[in-house]
Amino acid sequence: MLKLFSAFRKNKIWDFNGGIHPPEMKTQSNGTPLRQVPLAQRFVIPLKQHIGAEGELCVSVGDKVLRGQPLTRGRGKMLPVHAPTSGTVTAIAPHSTAHPSALAELSVIIDADGEDCWIPRDGWADYRSRRREELIERIHQFGVAGLGGAGFPTGVKLQGGGDKIETLIINAAECEPYITADDRLMQDCAAQVVEGIRILAHILQPREILIGIEDNKPQAISMLRAVLADSHDISMRVIPTKYPSGGAKQLTYILTGKQVPHGGRSSDIGVLMQNVGTAYAVKRAVIDGEPITERVVTLTGEAIARPGNVWARLGTPVRHLLNDAGFCPSADQMVIMGGPLMGFTLPWLDVPVVKITNCLLAPSANELGEPQEEQSCIRCSACADACPADLLPQQLYWFSKGQQHDKATTHNIADCIECGACAWVCPSNIPLVQYFRQEKAEIAAIRQEEKRAAEAKARFEARQARLEREKAARLERHKSAAVQPAAKDKDAIAAALARVKEKQAQATQPIVIKAGERPDNSAIIAAREARKAQARAKQAELQQTNDAATVTDPRKTAVEAAIARAKARKLEQQQANAEPEQQVDPRKAAVEAAIARAKARKLEQQQANAEPEQQVDPRKAAVEAAIARAKARKLEQQQANAEPEEPVDPRKAAVEAAIARAKARKLEQQQANAEPEEPVDPRKAAVEAAITRAKARKLEQQQANAEPEEQVDPRKAAVAAAIARAKARKLEQQQANAEPEEQVDPRKAAVAAAIARVQAKKAVQQKVVNED
């Protein structure tokens, strides 16, 4: 029955899996009271001493500052920092900070003036009359953050808790070896700590308030019990010493039996936890009106002559604190910020004290032993047995070493609290915590990159959607403009329609013929004449364009002319020395002669008016002339053996000559008034003219030496000649009075004229013969 009653007691505690019991080593520093350290000459205050973004600077180089004066502005989750003493801002530049890699962060450097003057302080002793929001804002603006090691802004944490917090836990376990800052603070300032707890309770209004403290702090337990003797709203739970019972999840389970869900927060189960040092800082911010400018720091280790706990101003160089405590470094001396399990080694001693600095450990060479070489994992599972978060450190080790980020995430590497228990028990001396920290950093970087990529994709898709909307709107405007033409377009369309209707009305209007009157066709005749004139003008322009475009090559013309002359000479020689066996057709000869003369005249006119485009190469012209002469000689030899064609009827020749003369006169008149339709190639004209002249000479010789085989009827010849002359006169009269509607081909006209002249001459000759 007694055991059953004990099980239902209110102060029941639970135990978590894993954990270790390393040597505590706390007696080196917890036996002496808190003391002040002399001010340093220079303070380095990093702008970021908490989780989250740094604040906005509100001072500049050369400014005079007082203790407690804000150096940055805190907006949102940004936490401000304050001047630790009065002095002058000498620089604002990057400086190495309290970090395992000693990364340089933007810092404000202040040279102290030694006066240590405060800003005007306005404390709220009657904080119970203040609203919850006012208290949270004051805590935030006074720079209060979690002093247990996380550095999370306290005001943000209180704001996030809201009205769902049922249990407020004050973490006083301080389980890591060597560290006694909270122990000494509770011994020397227990009343102030409890007052800070009451301010937090006033803000959160929880149903219960629990203080968790390990049983290895008897003096602190005594002081708290004395202060809480008359208080019934705050319960203190003394728990067994076990590392890491001071972890947030572990202490929550020990005191409440509730487990924080994976990936969640303690506020999800109605629990909010604050550190003892944080409660003390809340009291000083609200009641005393003092921003956080200092904190308790444990100085311990066998390399320090006077170990203990001191009030260290934020921004004080570590070297200054160690020298004040009698630091005696060895050849290979190391200094650890934090405890031996969760702390990190400082690369040098010029880094400043920040809000999360709770211990400076300077061990001797024999105190921690010689560092041993890392060996291969033997899969003994000792790390898994010691893990307080129920993880598999050996598997996480392999995943971290193999860059298998997905598997490490699946095995809940984010739940690792980096307590170092696994590395403490590892027989292979594997620094597991270092591997886990590196893996967490890489996963965080990957997620940050994925987040930026997702944001960039969202911006791109939004831009594409905007462009599509603009394009659709533009197309819609174009469609509207096409459907509804503008006023000017409407006027132009109406004017065009009116002109079309007017033309149609004029075209369909009938011509009325009245009795005794003649119809007036003058308008129609004038329109016809205008169209003819327009057509002739267009044809003249086209002819001028063609004449300008036609270019005669003088070299080819010269060659062809030479060939024609050679052929003509050869033909003359043949006619002079040879007796024709047959009569030559005089009609064909006359026609060809007339054609040749017409072409020759036209060629002379074109050559007189045309400018050659390019100079003739005399060498090429000489070569071509020689070739032409050779061809002419060969032609003479070939024609020496040729026979003439059949005899010609003189009657038909006379008629054709008369017709040719009439047509020639008509052609001359047309050429005087009209422009030729097409340009004649002068080269071909010259060749044909030469050939025609040769043939004409040959024909004359044949006619002079030949006797006609048949007698021509003189009456018929006279009648034909008279008819030809009458037709010629009639044709001349028609050409003199009429305007030609179409252009006449000059070559055909020349041929017809030549034929007419030959026929006329022949008819006259026949008439003379008949009269004789």
Swiss-Prot record:
Q: How does it assemble?
A: The complex is composed of six subunits: RsxA, RsxB, RsxC, RsxD, RsxE and RsxG.
Species the sequence originates in: Escherichia coli O157:H7 (strain EC4115 / EHEC)
Among PANTHER family, the record links this protein to: ION-TRANSLOCATING OXIDOREDUCTASE COMPLEX SUBUNIT C (PTHR43034:SF2)
Q: Where is this region: Disordered?
A: 602-684, 696-717, 727-746
Question: What keywords appear on the UniProt entry?
Answer: 4Fe-4S, Cell inner membrane, Cell membrane, Electron transport, Iron, Iron-sulfur, Membrane, Metal-binding, Repeat, Translocase, Transport
Q: Binding residues for [4Fe-4S] cluster 1, per the UniProt record?
A: 377, 380, 383, 426
Task: List the PROSITE patterns hit by this protein, alphabetically.
Answer: 4FE4S_FER_1, 4FE4S_FER_2
Q: Tell me which Gene Ontology terms the entry assigns under biological process.
A: electron transport chain
Kindly report the protein's main subcellular placement as a broad class. membrane
- Please report the record's description of how this protein sits within the membrane: Peripheral membrane protein
Q: How is the cofactor bound?
A: Binds 2 [4Fe-4S] clusters per subunit.
Q: Subcellular localization, per the record?
A: Cell inner membrane
> Where [4Fe-4S] cluster 2 is bound, by residue?
387, 416, 419, 422
Q: What does this protein do?
A: Part of a membrane-bound complex that couples electron transfer with translocation of ions across the membrane. Required to maintain the reduced state of SoxR.
Tagged with keyword Acetylation: no
Q: Lineage of the native species?
A: Bacteria, Pseudomonadati, Pseudomonadota, Gammaproteobacteria, Enterobacterales
Family per similarity comment: Belongs to the 4Fe4S bacterial-type ferredoxin family. RnfC subfamily.
The cofactor named in the record is: [4Fe-4S] cluster
**Record domain 4Fe-4S ferredoxin-type: where:** 369-397, 407-436
- Root EC class: translocase
A GO cellular component annotation here is:
plasma membrane
What Enzyme Commission number(s) does the record list for this chain? Answer: 7.-.-.-
- Show the ranges annotated as biased composition (Low complexity): 605-615
Which Gene3D superfamilies does the record cross-reference, listed alphabetically?
3.30.70.20, NADH-ubiquinone oxidoreductase 51kDa subunit
Q: Please give the name of this protein.
A: Ion-translocating oxidoreductase complex subunit C
